[in-house]
């Protein structure tokens, strides 16, 4: 997905009412997607092909790889992006249908509450994704994976498997954790900005 396409799509939508929200949308839409789409494919694209066990047999490699990766990181992070973007996308779709502009979101309490709820839901989804990512992938990719082949009736029951490019994958994991933390911080900051700007609007009245 090109940056021009994202820019045109972004300009056609109702922009978030906060400066932090606009930066967050641009951050999400360009940097995170580019990082995942380009670098994620480069690091994880051929992982299954280069994952090898001892003995190096195709059926054993496939079995152990499926055990090592119940879900591939690319699929997980793509789902994370889509799910986390949903609350904001639904709100902006609703705002576009109702012809709600940026000022209305901050001036009318009902729109402010709905927008804040969408941001809080986004934070909750990011926290859940962060916990799930830790549970699935941990913080480090080790060069050796011990595969349990007892269900295959193979002996020995524990086989050693080589994980390709484990150091690059560890760096990428840390980067994705960092993206999630930055996103959560931006969302929290956006809530405070909304409260501050709403308070200023009420004070001026």
Curated annotation (Swiss-Prot):
Residues 1-22, 96-111, 192-205 are cytoplasmic. One of its GO terms (biological process) is cell morphogenesis. It is found in: Cell membrane. Disulfide bonds join 53-161, 64-147. It is a multi-pass membrane protein. The chain crosses the membrane at residues 23-43, 75-95, 112-132, 171-191. Residues 44-74, 133-170 are extracellular. Its main location: membrane. Disruption phenotype: No visible phenotype. Eye morphology appears to be normal with no significant effects on lens transparency and refraction. Expression levels of the connexins Cx46 and Cx50 in lens tissue are slightly reduced. Signal peptide: none annotated. Pfam families: Connexin. Highly expressed in lens, where it is mainly found in lens fibers and to a lesser extent in lens epithelium. Weakly expressed in retina. Not detected in other tissues tested. Keywords: Cell membrane, Developmental protein, Disulfide bond, Membrane, Transmembrane, Transmembrane helix, Transport. One of its GO terms (cellular component) is connexin complex. Belongs to the connexin family. Beta-type (group I) subfamily. Mediates calcium-independent ATP release, suggesting activity as a hemichannel. Does not form functional gap junctions. May play a non-essential role in eye lens development. A connexon is composed of a hexamer of connexins. This is Gap junction epsilon-1 protein. It comes from Mus musculus.
